[in-house]
């Protein structure tokens, strides 16, 4: 019945001119053709499409059948013989139908699926889509629309993380990336071959450029890469990245020029639209490009060999900042790798303090601190700590001094502050061992820095448990200074400032320890009484109530806190003992001299 209906509609339309086809004819053709497909009359439908007499009708109306045919092809339960006929019908429709209508129809079909069906749809439709676009005159608009639609769908797919996931490619992203390169190549070649640089060719370049930058952001920003020595040829993302960077050069945007122009006042693009997009969207793409070139070494041979390590570091710091602002493990990891790659090219103590006037040279170490303190992944926390130390090592003395002040003022984390204080101690030690003192870690400059170290933020009421790492590091630094610097020499300026240190740090610390120990001892007593009654209870630590827990666990927490206070108290007592010994010894020496 469906076949007869379709033949009747076609017979009526055969006698009409193309411009006389009515909207009603299109609707009836679509309904009858769709029923033929649903009822399995595919052989008869194929004959109708192949009939030369129906060529004009198929050209104008046939695109309505593409959707039903494609949906049948995407169904895995069809017999092989049926699938073969569906493919023949589909190929004929692509060959015969109006390319403008086909383009929109194919893009709608690409947008329909979700989940794992996204890649199946794309892999099926890429080749026909390429064929259709090559028939159109306005290629720039068409390729732009197609690439944008394809990228939007691919960006919905999860990026495989491990080697096993990449090999399994459950969602088909890796296959799609490879197929997308093959889809795009003819249009890149068309740009290369067109020597006239017509307006249409320039527009095509721009659309390809947009696609390349979108691809650098997704999937390449989060994609993992094999080691080059390990199965490098089988790494789909390395292949995709290499081709995308190659496309950039081929369409007249070699990546060295692009990455070194990024962020400058001089505009990189010819069109305002691109300039606005660069400012808002392309930071991730540029960071991804820098990582691919400098860490993965993709097309690195195109870079000028004369670039200095300091220049490359300055260039990369903005991109590292972008990486560290993200939360994905793979993206943060890339930022750390790029930072390490850039820093290892530079000699220790050679990074001048003036570089810290550049915003990213301060925001990157602050970003490292955030990863160290907030990231849930231990390997990234440890790597960030190592990178912060490496960064400190590269700075000159004034740069180290400036960075220490900055991080002490901004980190708000006892462990980080303890780490900085240990670095300050190391710099003082190196300075005292030199024949010529380093002015940044001796005398007035050091005293100014010690003002940020040897004090309690809230005086005697400071939470000593929460600040225990910082306090212990500060006491150890003070003990070191008392031992190493004689009062008569006073190279560090410590002995001049000792009165202030005692008033601002040592005395409040004594009071705070007494208050804290009394509080925790009272809590231990309460917990022991609760243990006798075998009830759950709550305790207050640092002004906050700890959730209900068994009394045995509470006692462990409380005794651990008391142990920390005892440790601080013992170091404090030793520091005060050393001060007394040194002061007395100096007084006796001075009396002897007289």
Curated annotation (Swiss-Prot):
Any one GO biological process: positive regulation of cytokine production
Signal peptide stretch: none
PTM entry text: Phosphorylated on tyrosine residues.
Tissue: Ubiquitous.
Region span, Important for interaction with RBX1: 300-594
Effect of residue 219 to A: Loss of interaction with FKBP4 and FKBP1A
Region of interest called Alpha-helical region with structural similarity to HEAT repeats, as start-end residue ranges on this chain: 2-553
A UniProt-annotated Pfam family: Kinetochor_Ybp2
Superkingdom, taxonomy of origin: Eukaryota
Subunit-structure text: Interacts with FKBP4 and FKBP1A. Isoform 1: Interacts with RBX1 (via RING domain). Identified in complexes that contain RBX1 plus one of the cullins CUL1, CUL2, CUL3, and CUL4A. Identified in a SCF complex composed of CUL1, RBX1, SKP1, FBXW7 and GLMN. Component of a SCF-like complex consisting of CUL7, RBX1, SKP1, FBXW8 and GLMN. Interacts with unphosphorylated MET and is released upon MET phosphorylation.
Domain text: The C-terminal half of the protein is important for interaction with RBX1.
Disease connection: Glomuvenous malformations: Characterized by the presence of smooth-muscle-like glomus cells in the media surrounding distended vascular lumens.
Protein's name in the database: Glomulin
Source organism per UniProt: Homo sapiens (Human)
């Amino acid at each position: 019945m469906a076949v007869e209906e379709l033949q009747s509609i076609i017979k009526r339309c055969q006698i009409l001119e193309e411009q006389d086809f009515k909207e009603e004819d299109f609707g009836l053709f679509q309904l009858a053709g769709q029923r033929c497909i649903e009822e399995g009359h595919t052989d008869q439908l194929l004959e109708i499409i192949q009939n030369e007499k129906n060529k004009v009708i198929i050209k104008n109306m046939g695109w309505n059948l593409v959707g039903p045919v494609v949906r049948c092809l995407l169904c895995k339960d069809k017999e092989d013989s049926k699938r073969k006929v569906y493919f023949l019908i589909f190929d004929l429709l692509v060959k015969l139908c109006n390319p403008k209508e086909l383009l929109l129809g194919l893009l709608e079909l690409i947008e329909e699926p979700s989940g794992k069906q996204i890649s199946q749809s794309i892999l099926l439709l890429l080749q026909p889509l390429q064929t259709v676009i090559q028939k159109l005159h306005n290629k720039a608009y068409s390729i732009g629309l197609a690439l944008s639609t394809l990228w939007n769908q691919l960006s919905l797919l999860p990026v495989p993380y491990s080697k096993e996931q990449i090999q399994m490619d459950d969602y088909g992203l890796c296959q799609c990336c490879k197929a997308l390169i093959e889809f795009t190549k003819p249009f890149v070649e068309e740009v290369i071959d067109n020597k006239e640089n017509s307006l249409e060719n320039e527009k095509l370049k721009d659309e390809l450029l947009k696609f390349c930058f979108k691809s650098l952001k997704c999937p390449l920003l989060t994609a993992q890469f094999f080691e080059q020595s390990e199965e490098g040829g089988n790494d789909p993302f390395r292949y995709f990245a290499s081709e995308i960077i190659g496309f950039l050069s081929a369409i007249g945007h070699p990546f060295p020029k692009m990455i070194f122009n990024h962020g400058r006042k001089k505009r990189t693009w010819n069109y305002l639209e691109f300039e606005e997009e660069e400012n808002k969207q392309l930071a991730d793409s540029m960071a991804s490009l820098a990582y691919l070139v400098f860490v993965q070494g993709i097309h690195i041979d195109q870079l000028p060999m004369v670039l200095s390590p300091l220049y490359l570091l300055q260039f990369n710091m903005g991109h590292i900042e972008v990486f560290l602002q993200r939360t994905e493990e793979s993206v943060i990891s890339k930022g750390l790798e790029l930072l390490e790659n850039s820093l290892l090219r530079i000699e220790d103590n050679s990074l001048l303090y003036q570089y810290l006037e550049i915003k990213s040279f301060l925001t990157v170490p602050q970003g490292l601190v955030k990863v160290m303190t907030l990231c849930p992944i231990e390997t990234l926390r440890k790597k960030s700590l190592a990178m912060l130390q490496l960064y400190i090592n590269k700075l000159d003395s004034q740069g180290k001094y400036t960075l220490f002040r900055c991080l002490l003022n901004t980190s708000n984390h006892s462990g980080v502050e303890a780490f900085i204080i240990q670095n300050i101690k190391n710099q003082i030690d190196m300075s005292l061992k030199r024949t010529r003192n380093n002015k940044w870690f001796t005398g007035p400059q050091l005293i100014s820095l010690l003002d940020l170290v040897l004090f309690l933020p809230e005086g005697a009421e400071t939470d000593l448990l929460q600040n225990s790492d910082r306090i212990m590091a500060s006491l150890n630094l003070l003990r070191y200074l008392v031992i190493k610097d004689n009062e008569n020499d006073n190279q560090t300026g410590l002995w001049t400032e000792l009165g202030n240190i005692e008033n601002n740090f040592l005395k409040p610390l004594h009071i705070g320890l007494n208050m804290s120990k009394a509080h925790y001892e009272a809590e231990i007593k309460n917990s022991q009484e609760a243990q006798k009654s075998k009830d759950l209870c709550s305790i207050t630590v640092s002004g906050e109530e700890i959730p209900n827990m068994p009394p045995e666990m509470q006692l462990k927490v409380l005794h651990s806190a008391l142990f920390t206070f005892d440790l601080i108290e013992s170091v404090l007592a030793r520091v005060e003992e050393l001060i007394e010994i040194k002061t007395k010894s100096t007084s006796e020496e001075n009396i002897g001299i007289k």
